[in-house]
Amino acid sequence: MDIKAQLLQLKEEIKKEVQDIFDEKVLNEIKVKYLGKKGLITSVLKSLGSLSPEERKEVGQLANSIKEFLEEALKAKQEEIEKKKLEEILRKERLDISLPAEWFEPSASHPVLTTLKEITEIFKSMGFTVESGPEVEYEDYNFTMLNIPEHHPARDMQDTFYTSNGMLLRTHTSPVQIRSMLKKKPPIAIVAPGRVYRKDMDPTHSPMFHQIEGLMVDKNVSFKDLKGILKIFLENIFGKDIPIRFRPSYFPFTEPSAEVDVGCTVCKGKGCRVCKNTGWLEILGCGMVDPNVFKAVGIGPEDYTGFAFGLGIERIAMLRYQITDIRLLFTNDLRFNLQFRGIE
């Protein structure tokens, strides 16, 4: 039998064997049998050199067409096998959706996190970016570079949690402002939310609480800009009709400094136990960045001005949701937490 007849017979055998492929093992065996280094089709192609030029061309074309036919048939079988495997996996892993699902109690967003998220979004809408920093901080960043001198009462052991080697648990998020001014050039507009720590525990104070502080630095930034930003913020939090007042105050890192009050949200300014019969509630502290702070971070106070502000998140949450004891926010009592389901 000549080579051409052998190839045609080989093609018929291939058709029958391909039809009987049912798994990858058989498929690979057929691939090796015909297309391997010692495979039947490979052997035919290697023997073409012994043929005349006319026969070589005709037989070569036939051998290559059979090779292509086998490769396509094997590829189709491979896809068929993989499809069946996937169907089998899906059949075994199929879920009976008619079965009743396990009931999970709907969660409730914690009022502190809800308030923090809302405050952050308000400032982001005004062009501020959010920055963060370590909670274990250098004493220089927490105090010295913020114009808080060595013997200032805030540095006392009874007020601050010190660790070692000039490190402490930050008492405010102001160190994030220092870090931002050290790594960025003006203009700067940031807010820094996070946990802070102070040695204090009573119905209105906690040794750990959340703060958000803001900083804006640029040329010609004024106290008027500060008042405008805070007015927009407070109206978004408490409503457009909330009375707002600024009172002169003192902070080492701002000059001039002010504290901001809003009309009591409980008695609507008439006077009650919450506002100590003043009709006002203290909300935050603020002021223009002290030139000494700018000098500490390498920003020229003759070229740039800026303002800073800071407020306690728990304070805002307590006022908004009329919570009388800050310790309730940290008890993990579901009876308390689930009251706030749906407020987010």
Swiss-Prot record:
Family of the protein in this entry: Belongs to the class-II aminoacyl-tRNA synthetase family. Phe-tRNA synthetase alpha subunit type 1 subfamily.
Cofactor note: Binds 2 magnesium ions per tetramer.
A GO CC annotation given for this chain: cytoplasm
Pfam families: Phe_tRNA-synt_N (PF02912), tRNA-synt_2d (PF01409)
Keyword Acyltransferase part of the UniProt annotation: no
Name by which UniProt lists this protein: Phenylalanine--tRNA ligase alpha subunit
Keywords, alphabetical: Aminoacyl-tRNA synthetase, ATP-binding, Cytoplasm, Ligase, Magnesium, Metal-binding, Nucleotide-binding, Protein biosynthesis
Family annotation (HAMAP family): Phe_tRNA_synth_alpha1 (MF_00281)
Assembly notes: Tetramer of two alpha and two beta subunits.
PANTHER family: PHENYLALANINE--TRNA LIGASE, MITOCHONDRIAL (PTHR11538:SF41), PHENYLALANYL-TRNA SYNTHETASE (PTHR11538)
Residue sites binding Mg(2+) per the record: 255
InterPro entries linked: aa-tRNA-synth_II (IPR006195), aa-tRNA-synth_II/BPL/LPL (IPR045864), Phe-tRNA-synth_IIc_asu (IPR004529), Phe-tRNA_ligase_II_N (IPR004188), Phe_tRNA_ligase_alpha1_bac (IPR022911), Phenylalanyl-tRNA_Synthase (IPR002319), tRNA-bd_arm (IPR010978)
Origin: domain of life: Bacteria
Localisation per UniProt entry: Cytoplasm
Catalytic activity: tRNA(Phe) + L-phenylalanine + ATP = L-phenylalanyl-tRNA(Phe) + AMP + diphosphate + H(+)
Example GO biological process: phenylalanyl-tRNA aminoacylation
Gene that encodes the chain: pheS
This enzyme's EC code(s): 6.1.1.20
Cofactor dependency: Mg(2+)
SUPFAM superfamilies: Class II aaRS and biotin synthetases, tRNA-binding arm
Gene Ontology MF annotations: ATP binding; magnesium ion binding; phenylalanine-tRNA ligase activity; tRNA binding
